[in-house]
Amino acid sequence: MDKATFDKGLEIRKAVLGREFVENAFKTADDFNMPMQELATEYCWGWCWGREGLSLKTRSLINLAMISALNRPHELKVHVKGALNNGVTREEIREVFLQVAIYCGVPAAVDSFRQAREVFAQIDQEK
């Protein structure tokens, strides 16, 4: 493991997903899934998200589209919240999901809208 890349990834991951969420992911990891937490932090967040070629906002928009296409509702909710943290608006999220409907299918988009609305409701309730 490259410590500098891991540390950079940990910083970005906490900034996007929230410190509490990330700390909980590591706290609840066991011997079985800790290597996945380390891999995601170093390579996904440190190497990929840490590159300078795209802004965090743009990376969030791309992730929303890809995760919608893959039908990964849990991860989508995490990344909807992260996208909002990166300055993506609810209107921009809606536009991503409308494009998902055309290129990935209406069922994928319907599920994505459903997941996003749950995140929005949770955020609105916490205000």
Describe each region flagged by the PLM:
Residues 1-57, 85, 110-127:
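Acidic, glycine/proline-rich low-complexity segments that act as flexible tails and inter-domain linkers
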Residues 40-44, 61-68, 96-101:
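Short alpha-helical scaffolding segments that buttress acidic/His motifs in well-ordered protein cores
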Residues 52, 70-73, 87, 104-107, ...:
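Residues at alpha-helix boundaries and short interhelical turns
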Residues 91-96, 111-114:
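A glycine-rich phosphate/pyrophosphate-binding beta-strand-loop-alpha-helix module
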Residues 99, 106-110:
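Substrate/cofactor-recognition hotspot
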